[in-house]
Structure formats: structure tokens, C-alpha cells
Amino acid sequence: MQLTGAEIICECLLEQGVDTVFGYPGGAALNTYDALYKYSDKIRHILTAHEQGASHAADGYARATGKTGVVMTTSGPGATNIVTGLATANIDSIPLVAITGNVTTDQLGRDSFQEVDIVNIVKPVTKASFLVEKVEDLADTIRKAFALAQHGRKGPVLVDVPKDVTANKTEFVQTIPERPRTFEIRNPEKVRVVQEMIKNAKCPMIYAGGGIISADASEEFKAFAELIDAPVCCSLMGLGCIPADHPLCVGNIGMHGGY
């Protein structure tokens, strides 16, 4: 079926199971927002007072739900205002996809009104960033962005979409998105070595990180700590992997420690 680039963005979001996006509209993103209104029965848009707030809200949503957070903004300051949110998600390994508007492709690189090279600006604080210059490439780029955000060490990915790309039409074919790969034990022998080390430890202590929470393994981790009767200290990202009032929990350590 023939769809505009803006409609393709919405269809790709639905493919990925997205039901909530955070953002702040502007001129270069109006086509996308017009399409988003047509999809409002399936995709909820939460308007924030500032783009930075939208990026942090998408980050928090991803942490709370385990889903990939999505933030939408316009070009120029709309795009640069989300850099701090992207950096936060990058450092903490939070899956996030940012979709930004930009000036039309014929105006790129001409110092146009509210034009910045956001793709290169965010490279140090994202897993990847893409500029889509043809509507035919849009769907595959968004799908790739979600795959990158969700696979391996999770993190933010930015897709920059010029205004004419969101207005142009092309054929769209729905696909079943690739699901994140499950973890595999690739070296059972090393696991057995670790088991022996834990078994023979005289005073074992566990330093727990955020991977436990992102893997939704808090209950299993608590059972493991109780089984070997080891006190648990946490990194900043690991806080919450075991209840703070649990007898084995000794809280955070280091300069941010509370014990």
C-alpha cells in the first residue's frame, strides 16, 4: 500500500509494539504529527513542556516498562534539546529511539532556518544515528534503529527525517519485527568454574548491577543471594534488584554509598 513517510513512521511504531511516544512538535515535524493524530487511537502522544523533558520521559518509560522509549521532536533546537536525554540513556544502557524532523533534503547543508547536523552531533552519545534522504529507505531505517536499540548492550538510536521525506509516498509492506536474541550459555565450563569459586568462597559478597533489572531477574537474583547467604551491594543502576529492607542488602557502595 502507498503511504506517506509520516504514515510509514506510525506504521513502523505499531510494528514494534509502541503505544506511547513523548515529544514536542515543530515545523519540520508537522507531517509526522499530522499522521500521529490519525493514529491517536493506537498510539498515545504525551506532550511535554520542553524537548529535554520528552527525552527524559521516554528514558524513564523504558526503564519502568522494559519497552523501547520513543521521543519525537522537530529540527534545530528541538533536536539538540534531547542530547542530554540521549546521553543519559546511552550511559545507562536504556533502549530509546529518537525521531527528529529536519529541513527538506534540498536545504540540507545550506544553513537553513533551524537546521543542524544532529546526526553527527549525537554520534558520541548514541549507538547509531541515521539521516533518511529517501522515503524508500525510511521503513528499513526505523526497523534497524529499533533492532540496534534493543539488541546487545541496549541504548539510544536517532533517526533524522527531512520534511519532504515525511511528505513523499512509497509502497509500504508490513513485516514482523526481529525480536531481541535470548542469552545463551556459550561456555558451560566457565560457568562450572564460577560455581566452584562461589562454593569455595569463605566470605562471598555480591556486587549487583543493572543487568539484573533489565533482564527482569530480580526474584531469581534474590533467591541466589539467599541460597549462598551472601550480602549484596549495588551499583547505581542495580539499586532495586533486591529489596532495600532485605537482611542481605547493604545498599550502594562507593562515593554514593549510604551505609
Annotated model-derived regions:
Residues M1-Y259:
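N-terminal alpha/beta PP-like core and its mobile active-site loop of ThDP/TPP-dependent enzymes
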